[in-house]
Amino acid sequence: MKVLIGVDESRESRDAVKTSFELFGPNAEYTIANIAGRFGTGVLFNVGYAPTGQLSAKYLTEQFAAAEETARGAAELVPGGDVEIDAELGDAGVELCRLAEEQTSDVVVIGSQDKSVWQRLLDPSVGRYLIDHAPCPVLVVR
């Protein structure tokens, strides 16, 4: 069984990793992925900076390194540590769906963060996107 686990720095993500191992056991193939969001040019303009290729490249490199570190940290929660890690830049829901399809994952697992209605309006739910678009079943761990 191929299990794709989407993580961030939250406690809920750590719970999703642990629950995945409890449910699917040591024989499953695990991939732990963290997706770092990309910024648009408006973000830099809003804080008074004009984007340059050099600034953009540095920012993206830092974002990618942080995403890799988050995925590696979550991978340490899997007993035995036999886990693939993946770090991507982009929209979390879209990228997790793409990874699930590329890897022919049997299930995508994520942790659920309780958000208020206002928080969901400002930051749409990755879980909702996955449930609607993933090419395989989605397990949302609470």
What kind of feature is each model-predicted range?
Residues 1-54:
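Small/aliphatic-rich secondary-structure junction motif
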Residues 25, 79, 135:
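Short conserved AdoMet
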Residues 31-33, 84-88, 139:
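General small-molecule cofactor/ligand-binding pocket signal
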Residues 34, 111-113, 142:
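Short secondary-structure boundary segments
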Residues 52-69:
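A short acidic, glycine-rich active-site loop
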Residues 75-108:
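Structural beta-alpha unit
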Residues 107-132:
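Glycine-rich, Arg-bearing micro-motifs that act as flexible, cationic patches
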Residues 132-142:
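Short, flexible loop segments at boundaries between secondary-structure elements
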